[in-house]
A protein has these predicted regions:
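Catalytic domains of carbohydrate-active enzymes that cleave complex glycans
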Residues: 1-141, 223-234, 238-245, 254-263, ...
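Extracytoplasmic
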Residues: 107, 117-386
Length: 386
């Protein structure tokens, strides 16, 4: 009633929506596994109904009908008349069975043979250690496949086999074989069809004069992400920052503790300091994710300053509470974003700081886009040097 049902019901809805998204992707990529994923969607839909009935039977029906409100199939604010089975797609297979290879790569909807060239996301020195491509069947008969890399520094988790269904293959880089710079290679995958699929592999090894120190937030895969709760607090006589547990998108946030109605310069303000290691230089978009908050003093608002290596970069303020639409959106997202530009003139270690100029700021995350930040609702994972 209080623990199991919320966990199980959340799992059912997550798995249902995930399977529905994969079903749509598999159909677009012409995978034979499209129908199997449709069956998975329907199984989780049935699981949700089963959980509802279980809840209604607790204590001889003590809470009967409490979970009866429809919650699957929303298309606008009001609930549908009943839980609507999700729309799924299936794929008919040839009879008698034949084999027909398809190949896809992570991070892309494209697939071979419909798309001539495929590319894995770029490997970076401190980024994801492995990328994945998938060899799959577009029909119902098993076939043999093989994969070969054009460069010795491209490492394949497996290079051949027999498959009937989807087979993911991990790809990694032997960085010890690479000099500093940008490198390219290909992976040729053969199975059925003429010529096979060619997958482009790129790797960037920056030329660095120093290495990150343990605990540094590292630029990887085109971004730097930093959880505020892991910053170093630099208190001043004028105030400090305190951790707020079980709050925000990362589970913890940092709240500025200043006297009411105070208004400080960035030299006077308490700071959250982040040791950051950049592998590139440029003018990078920086985003602060703060919790929606109302100011103690509408005249001064909620303001923070951003500094890099002690130099002032920008002063940012949360929008006025009079902007009701912006406030409503912030509450729904549980975050308000403030943006500025961060000038990084040299690669290596830097000290990024966020300083509370007025009371009320609750910082969740800091994200710097160094050129390849992908769109997402919750943002990318952070990386720290071991």
């Amino acid at each position: 009633q209080l623990v199991a049902h919320p966990v199980w019901a959340t799992q059912a809805m997550f798995e249902l929506n995930r399977a529905q998204a994969l079903n749509a992707l598999y159909a677009e990529q012409d995978r034979a596994s499209t129908s199997a994923m449709a069956a998975t969607v329907n199984a989780w839909f049935e699981r949700d109904a089963e959980l509802t009935e279980m809840y209604h039977s607790i204590k001889g029906g003590k809470w009967n009908r409490m979970m009866s409100q429809p919650h699957i199939g929303y298309v606008y604010w009001n609930n549908p008349p009943a839980n609507i089975p999700p729309v799924v797609q299936t794929k008919a297979l040839a009879q008698p069975a034949v084999a027909d290879m398809g190949v896809s790569v992570e991070g892309s909807r494209a697939y071979w043979p419909a798309t001539g060239g495929l590319s894995l996301p770029e490997f970076t020195l401190y980024g994801e250690a492995t990328r994945t491509f998938t060899v799959y069947n577009r029909q119902g008969k098993a076939f043999n496949w093989s994969a070969k890399a054009s460069q010795p520094w491209i490492i394949l988790g497996k290079n051949s086999g027999e498959l009937l269904a989807d087979t993911p293959v991990a790809v990694s880089i032997d960085w010890s074989q690479l000099e500093a710079g940008h490198h390219e290679g290909t992976i040729n995958v053969k199975g059925t069809g003429w010529g096979g699929a060619n997958i482009k592999v790129t790797a960037h090894k920056p030329e660095l004069t120093a290495r990150p120190v343990s605990g540094d937030f590292i630029e990887a895969d085109g971004y730097v992400a930093m959880n505020a709760s892991e910053a170093k607090v630099k208190s001043t006589p004028n105030g400090s920052w305190h951790k707020v547990a079980v709050h925000g998108r990362t589970g913890q946030a940092m709240s500025a503790a200043l006297p009411p109605y105070s208004s400080l310069t960035h030299q006077q303000a308490p700071a959250l300091e982040f040791p950051v290691f950049f592998t590139s230089t440029g003018e990078f978009p920086l985003t602060l994710q703060l919790s929606p908050s109302l100011p103690f003093d509408e005249a001064t608002g909620i303001k923070v300053a951003v500094t890099l290596d002690g130099e002032h970069v920008a002063t940012l303020a949360l929008p006025s509470q009079k902007d009701k639409q912006a406030w409503a959106q912030g509450v729904m997202d549980n975050v308000k974003e403030l943006t500025t530009t961060l000038p990084v003139t040299k690669a290596g270690r830097h000290r990024l700081a966020v300083k509370a100029l007025t009371p009320g700021a609750v910082l969740q995350r800091v994200i710097v886009d160094t050129g390849n930040l992908k769109p997402s609702y919750l943002g990318p994972p952070q990386r720290r040097a071991p």
